[in-house]
Amino acid sequence: PFSLQLGDPNTIAERTGITTVADFRRRDMAAGGQGAPLAPLLHQHCCASPNKNRAIVNIGGIANITLLLANGARVAFDTGPGNVLMDLWIARHNGARFDKNGEWATGGSVDTAFLAELMSEPYLALAAPKSTGRELFNGAWLEQRLASLKQWPSPQNIQATLLEFTATTLSTALLAGMRQGEIYLCGGGAHNTALLKRIGKLMPGYYVGTTAEIGIDPDWLEAMAFAWMAQQTLDGIAVDTSPFTGAKKPVMLGGIYPSPTSAS
């Protein structure tokens, strides 16, 4: 397995004059892990509760969950698409970068035949730990699923079904992994009020909100996670990613690229 990380840390360190830590995923992969998800390392550090089950749900292009159970158990994995398919579809038909508050999707209706086709994706049945990305869930994947239908739904109904797909895959994973508890969303999808409401309806008895309610800006949590990982590496601390990526042992993630001043 191989992961290509964009951005050259040598150039970043040289031009900014700041010691840079980068390329976190490949060390995890070298230790037998999948290289993702890594943000759960911070989730367990700052979001766990000793007396409540909690889940942190990061909805970026891909959605992932971190289960932080009160008994100390930790599980994290990618559930499937987050915003990626909805963003692709609305960009194609409306020229927008994203469906603000899920408004376009809300005006449509879920097509059950199309939803069933989406839910037949084999990745969804794999056991954790598992990770995925745009190499699977992309425009070509969506076209293949649509091509299997006898009749295409309207573009707006497709958008409604894609929102339901994200909500269903997330809620299914959460219900299977956690009995009751609190669910906090972060990432760009946390701003999609229609998606947040739909997840709440699919999970009666659970509290559903955003990480802002536990003191963390939903837009900053992933950046915070990598800053925290960088500090662990600078301090010479190995981190245990085994519950999340399947790595065989704790490792120090990323390489250190000194600033020009510290290197001289």
Predicted regions and their residues:
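Conserved ATP-utilizing enzyme core subdomain
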Residues: 75-167, 236, 249-264
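Generic structural signal for well-ordered alpha-helical scaffold segments
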Residues: 43-48, 147, 164-175, 231
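A glycine-rich, Thr/Ser-enriched phosphate-binding loop motif common to dinucleotide/cofactor-binding enzymes
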Residues: 31-41, 158-169
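Catalytic-loop motifs flanking and including active-site residues across diverse enzymes
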Residues: 8, 39, 81-86, 162, ...
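Glycine-rich phosphate-binding loop signature in dinucleotide/nucleotide-binding domains
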Residues: 49-52, 152, 177-179
